[in-house]
Every structure is written in structure tokens, then in C-alpha cells.
Amino acid sequence: MDLLGYMGAEGHEQIVMCSDPAVGLQAIIAIHDTTLGPACGGVRIWPYESEQEAVMDALRLSRAMTYKSAAADLPLGGGKGVIIADAHTQKTEALLRSYGRFVDTLAGRYLSTKDVGSTGRDLEYVGQETARGGRQSRLPTSPPSFERSRPSRGHGYLFQLAGPSEGHGGRGGEA
């Protein structure tokens, strides 16, 4: 895979490979775009089958966060952290705090929130090592300020966008 070529073609700014063998941390932080502000996105803890799978997921999800932030008219860009681990058996305070130290090295370019496999308590551990993220997002992942919104039959809302309709699965904590 031509990683730098892919990143350039998709508009990614940075990828950080994080390794701390002492605590078993293997993580990737992808920053897609910081034009509107710091990259914001959750930290996904997942037992990826390969490093390449984890890298591609981080890149894909960071790009999606750029568009979510822009659609919600937030002064944020898109980013994503992924930790290669089983959230049920390998997640420890030491691992999360180590991840927080890597987030801190980005000096505010990336703000970490929760995602699949991570909890509010996990973010407290991350936050002990960085003032840049490590908090639960209070922002909805679906923007509430479109032209018109009404409850849908399922969860969440249906938003009317000056023409096409788009369904969103509620507020969620995942990106």
C-alpha cells in the first residue's frame, strides 16, 4: 500500500503510529483536516486483524469526522484514534494513560472523545495525561440545526437539506 499517496489523495494531514510495549499499546492517530479547527474524533478500541486494517480504519473514520464536524457547523476538523486491542480483555488504565501521552504530543491538533470500545471512564484516564481531549463529547453526532427536523419512525431524526433527505441514527457516541 502506498500510504503517503493515499493520504495525499484523500486530503489527510498526519498519521501518528503509537507504540508502548511496556503496557501493550499499539495505536494510530489520524488527522484528516484542521482547516476549521483542531481534529476531533473518538478513540476506537478494537482487535484489528492487522496493522494495515487499523491504519485504514483510522484514515477512513478521520475523514468522516471532518465531514460530520463541517455539517454540524462546528469549529473542528476530523481525526480518529484507534487502539489495537480487545476492549474487554486488554484495555487497562496504563494503556489508556499511555495513549493520552501520545495525544498530548500533538499539542492540541487532535481532541480525543469516546467511540466503540471506549467509555467515559476510559477518557478520564486519557485525560490524566493530556488536557487535549480525554473527555466525553457533549456534542450530538447529528446536527440539530438544519432547515427542518422531525422525529423519524426509528431512532433519531430525519433532516431536510434543501432538497435531498438524509436519515441519521440519533446522537450516538460513535463515528
Question: Which positions does each model-derived feature cover?
Answer:
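Short helix/loop capping segments that flank catalytic or ligand/cofactor-binding pockets
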Residues: 26-27, 54, 93
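GHKL/Histidine-kinase-like ATPase module
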Residues: 12-17, 23-30, 42
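Short, Gly/Pro- and small/polar-rich lid/capping loops
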Residues: 1-19
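N-terminal cap/recognition module
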Residues: 31-66
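Glycine/serine-rich phosphate-binding loop and adjoining beta1-alpha1 elements at the start
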Residues: 69-71, 75-174
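Residues in well-ordered beta-strands of folded domains
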Residues: 17-19, 30-32, 46, 84, ...
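N-terminal glycine-rich anion-binding loops that anchor highly charged ligand groups
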Residues: 22-38, 70-75
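Gly/Ser/Thr-rich helix-start
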Residues: 25, 38, 42-43, 78-82, ...
